Amino acid sequence: MRNLIGKNKMHRGLMPIGDGEQLGINFQTNGSYYSSLSTSYSTNWFGNKRPNSFSVSLFYSKQSDISSYYRNNALYNSLNYGYGYGYGMLNNSYYNYESLLDDDKNIRMFGASIGWGKRLRWPDDYFQFMASVGYTRYMLRDWSYFYIANGNCNNLNLGLTLSRTSTDNQLFPRRGSEFMVSLAVTPPWSLFDGKDYAHLALDPNSATYEGELQDMYRWIEYHKWKFKSRTYTALTNSQKCFVLMTRVEMGLLGSFNKDKKSPFETFYVGGDGMSGYSYGYAEETIGMRGYDNGSISTSSAYTESTGRRTSNNAYGYDRFTLELRYPFMLGNTTIYGLTFVEGGNAWADIKKFNPFNLKKSAGVGVRIFLPMVGLMGIDWAYGFDKVYTSGGWTKGGGQFHFILGQEF
């Protein structure tokens, strides 16, 4: 973006023109079911003199649901004739999935954020501090996948992140570590709005039930804590060597009022961990290889008694990984294989958080980095423990997982 505004001008006010600035516009759609548009700007030299980062972003997305008529007929067919959801004549279905989307049932999201970061000199030069302010508006219309199906919900939050990175290579680290601790917090609206949340929205059959839900979640409140770490240890001194990677992750989503737990920003645990649209769109996706997507967090919501149920996802999770890697090709194109053991779990009630109660898995995989494509990979993992799925309680068993993009 150097000299984008005027000829031979290196800076325009406080904002530098050039020096690694990034301007991005992204649009995604799969037709009438889902679409999103986002734009962002970032620079690492805000203020001209010091390496301070600055970023601003905007996004909008819309996701539609299928009609109740189609859902009921597909269920009837699957029970009586073995038919299921399908596209056209696939799976012997008489219904075209895309043509029976109900645009009157949807969730729309609009959001904006602004962030500032600074490299620290203490305890050492590898530390960085980030602060951000974000706002998201959830606009729901007959959206049956959330605790609240209709209305507008607002999320205004402050994010604080302290991180340290000392790895020797971004694509295939041999030595060093990555640590990150973060807090996202909203104003404690329930402490000063004067509402009695203990007696709101208790009777789903009440004529005022949806209005009471809107009052309860017009402004979302929570405090969200996360810790992530990775370490890399080369087992020999050669360039192509075995590298041992260890990972520890934990996350907790707390509330200021036990009767106003947030139905958003929960943890969706299990599977490949790839982000993207889903029925529980306003959630954080956490991978756990060897299990179906979301099956670990769903199991916790199904088995734990948490009083007022506000989400089918988890409010706490942990994840531990031991991974052995070996590079087949290094450079602009990087290819390496890996084998791993992994353990983790999720809890709907954070009072029951137990880092030693783990769902375990093991497997092998490969990663390929291509300059024009980015990082891709495939893993095969076997889950040793039972989780709750649509078929009841079953072992994770053998699972293939596809990976796109770099994960922290």
Regions found by a protein language model. Give the residues of each.
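C-terminal outer-membrane beta-barrel translocator/porin domains of Gram-negative envelope proteins
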Residues: 1, 141-328, 339-340, 347-349, ...
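Gram-negative/organellar outer-membrane beta-barrel architecture
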Residues: 1-172, 177-179, 297-301, 375, ...
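Active/binding-pocket-proximal capping segment
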Residues: 1-2, 58, 248, 336-347, ...
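Active-site lining segments that contact anionic ligands and/or coordinate catalytic metals
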Residues: 20-22, 34-36, 51-55, 176-178, ...
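Short secondary-structure boundary/capping segments
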Residues: 72-75, 263-265, 354
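Secondary-structure transition into beta-strands, especially the periplasmic turns and strand N-termini
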Residues: 120-127, 236-242, 330-332, 374
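Short, loop-centered acidic/histidine patches that primarily coordinate divalent metals
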Residues: 340-344, 367-373, 379-383, 407
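Strand-loop-strand
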Residues: 349, 353-373
